[in-house]
Regions:
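Conserved catalytic-site region of short-chain dehydrogenase/reductase
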Residues: 337
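Flexible phosphate-sensing "switch/lid" loops adjacent to ATP/NTP-binding sites
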Residues: 1-322, 327, 344-347, 370-371, ...
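Catalytic nucleophile serine of serine hydrolases
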Residues: 332
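Conserved P-loop NTPase catalytic core
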Residues: 348-375
């Protein structure tokens, strides 16, 4: 079987739009009839996903795989770093935890991971026609270039042609692109086949003189000017923007606590799309106010975030709301916090042995251990008022929770999962709201409590919504990028039947 062709997208900075451009290219190539896979050698992210075989990978490559119409595969993201403190991360290699590592130690040792990276890439290259590779940050970070395994270092290892993208929305895009090219070594510059200006607003004609000068100075063609697209697709940078939302502008007010180490807050994107649910992220008791429900999300450090919750007064405020009957939902680490006790006998979570009291809103006890549970799950909710709702989710956690009360749902194998007591609910299942059934029942429950007619809403399924948004993204890029040049950079001819509708 012939080895796949590849194209790599690098950026002038973090947030230039690499992830979404890669998703767009995955979608476009798949639409053009190719078997496509995304690849990012090393990803740093708060949000992760569990594959069908129980391995953990970054969500950016999951979205790109969905764009390509293929099953997410841990080979697409062999190295995942999940920040657990300001100076260190959990290091995940090929979907398995290697351990906690300070940043300085990881930088010293990361080149030892090159065999894992190449094994994953070469395996993908045997199974697909095109690999769309995403870089990280900027390839011109002088202090990081010597041990680079994710930008030009990776491009050299897999002989990848490179597209360099700059973000005009932040200003200074010509300096970004020219400066990045100038800081590269001659052999690295030779890998760049074209430049892309991303997130443009307005009349592209205004840019023509600047584009001509940029091409003259860099000796590189501009492959396209991509407009600021409104596609609602998760990527690590836009997800961080979502955390800034402070005001609910819909009839129902859902307050999600923005924990210092919040993770997998992609769980709540389906709620954001519901026409009646206003989702906002809060960090203070003043911001919390009196919402229609409170959600405690997942976290990369349950113990530290529980202590933060206690110190800033949110624990007392949430407990008071729960006593008044306000619904409270905890997911993963948030679920653990809602219980009676959290024991860390080996210092797995907090670095030293200790036992903490939880919020005491659920009859559960959690004990942390080194082994992480990673699995996809199907479940049926057994607790009112959501009884009968079917959902599919995944678990990523180290704690084991003992439940004395009623479970929230039952897994496909008959195992009880989660806990419910009154209007307080807890579960380990990430992705629970991707099920349209549970989202609708959750919204209807809040509507009934507030005297709102839930029939006023007619939401679409998240799967349908994501498909629409991916198609919107692909169309926007297809119409503004010289795809013939992109194909030529890979040594391929653009399929005639689709063409490029510029």
């Amino acid at each position: 079987m012939s080895k796949a062709k590849c194209i790599m997208v690098q950026g002038t900075m973090s947030g230039a739009g690499k992830s979404l451009l890669c998703a767009a290219l995955c979608r476009i190539f798949a639409q053009d009839g190719w078997r496509v896979a995304p690849f990012k050698s090393q990803n740093m992210a708060l949000n992760s996903f569990v594959t069908r075989d129980g391995l953990e990978m970054g969500r950016a490559q999951v979205v790109q795989a969905q764009a390509a119409g293929v099953e997410p595969d841990v080979r697409m993201n062999p190295i995942l770093l999940k920040p657990s403190s300001d100076i260190g991360s959990q290091v995940i290699v090929n979907g398995e935890v290697r351990g906690q590592m300070p940043a300085a130690e990881y930088f010293r040792r990361k080149k030892q991971l090159i065999p894992d990276i190449l094994a994953a890439y070469n395996s993908l290259a045997e199974d697909f026609d095109i690999i769309v590779i995403e870089g990280a940050g900027s390839p011109a970070e002088i202090n990081l270039k010597a041990d680079d395994i994710v930008n030009m270092g990776l491009a050299k290892l897999v002989d990848a042609p490179v597209l360099l993208v700059g973000d005009i929305d932040r200003g200074g895009v010509f300096a970004q692109l020219f400066g990045t090219v100038e800081l590269l070594e001659p052999d690295e510059r030779a890998r760049i086949k074209g430049l892309i200006i991303n997130k443009f607003r307005g009349d592209v004609g205004i840019l023509r003189p600047g584009l001509a000068m940029l091409e003259e100075k860099t000796h590189l063609p501009v492959f396209g000017v991509v407009p600021y697209l409104k596609a609602d697709i998760e990527d690590e940078d836009s997800l961080s923007d979502r955390l800034q939302v402070k005001n609910a502008v819909k009839p129902l007010d859902a307050a999600i606590v923005r924990l210092p180490h919040i993770s997998n807050f992609t769980d709540f994107m389906p709620l954001e799309q519901h026409p009646l649910l206003g989702v906002r992220y809060v960090q203070t008791t003043r911001e919390l106010g009196a919402p229609d429900c409170v959600i405690l999300p997942g976290t990369k450090n349950t113990v530290d975030d529980l202590l933060w919750l206690r110190q800033c007064g949110l624990e007392a405020a949430i407990s008071k709301l729960a006593q008044r009957g306000t619904p409270v939902l905890g997911v993963c680490g948030g679920y653990q916090m809602l219980g009676q006790t959290l024991a860390d006998p080996e210092g797995t979570e907090s670095g030293r042995p200790q036992t903490l009291r939880g919020l005491g809103l659920l009859p559960t006890q959690t004990t942390f251990a080194a082994e992480k549970r990673r699995t996809q799950s199907q479940a049926t909710v057994t607790a009112e008022p959501f009884a009968g709702a079917h959902l599919t989710g995944y678990e990523i956690h180290t704690g084991r929770t003992t439940v004395q009360g009623a479970p929230l749902c039952t897994l496909a194998d008959g195992t009880p999962e989660g806990c419910v007591q009154g209007q307080v609910f807890g579960t380990y299942l990430h992705g629970l709201f991707d099920s349209g059934e549970l989202t609708e029942q959750f919204a209807a429950y809040l509507c009934r409590r507030k005297g709102i007619d839930p029939a006023a809403a007619a939401p679409i399924s998240m799967q349908e919504y994501r498909t629409q948004q991916l198609d919107l993204l692909a169309d926007g890029v297809r119409h503004n990028l010289d795809l013939a040049a992109v194909y030529a950079a890979m040594g391929l001819a653009q399929p005639a039947e689709r063409g490029n509708d510029q």
